[in-house]
Curated annotation (Swiss-Prot):
Species the sequence originates in: Physarum polycephalum (Slime mold)
Any Gene Ontology biological process: cell-cell adhesion
InterPro entries per record: Beta/gamma_crystallin (IPR001064), Ca_cell_adhesion_N_dom (IPR015059), G_crystallin-like (IPR011024)
Entry superkingdom: Eukaryota
Region of interest called N-terminal arm, as start-end residue ranges on this chain: 1-13
Protein name: Spherulin-3A
Keyword check for Repeat: yes
Location in the cell: Cytoplasm
Swiss-Prot/TrEMBL keywords: Cytoplasm, Repeat
Protein family (similarity comment): Belongs to the beta/gamma-crystallin family.
Main location as per UniProt: cytoplasm
Keyword Cell wall biogenesis/degradation set for record: no
Gene Ontology cellular-component annotations: cytoplasm; membrane
Length: 103
């Protein structure tokens, strides 16, 4: 698991970009691997409003820590400009990032 603050452009394979505001604005983080509790990352818990997922990557984003509660699955190279549309705006507390090879 790795979380780095500050991103630009689009995520690579195995990466998910999280943004504090809608439309990929504000503070941002690059996540690789699973994070079971966003409270362990300063400033990240319950603040994410938009998401980008890299190629050959899927993300499972959970409302609660330890991969519990409501969640959404995001497919490779997908983008969500406003998590309000998924009832998870400013409410994400854990994530699973999975990579796969193309067929």
């Amino acid at each position: 698991m790795s979380v780095c603050k500050g991103v630009s452009g689009n995520p690579a394979k195995g990466e998910v970009f999280l943004y504090k505001h809608v439309n990929f604005q504000g503070d941002s983080w690059k996540v690789t691997g699973n994070v079971y509790d966003f409270r362990s990352v300063s400033g990240l818990n319950d603040v994410v409003s938009s998401v980008k997922v890299g190629p050959n990557t899927k993300a499972f984003i959970f409302k609660d820590d330890r991969f519990n509660g409501n969640f959404i699955r995001l497919e490779e190279s997908s983008q969500v400009t406003d998590l309000t549309t998924r009832n998870l705006n400013d409410a994400i507390s854990s994530i699973i990032v999975a990579t796969f090879e193309s067929a």
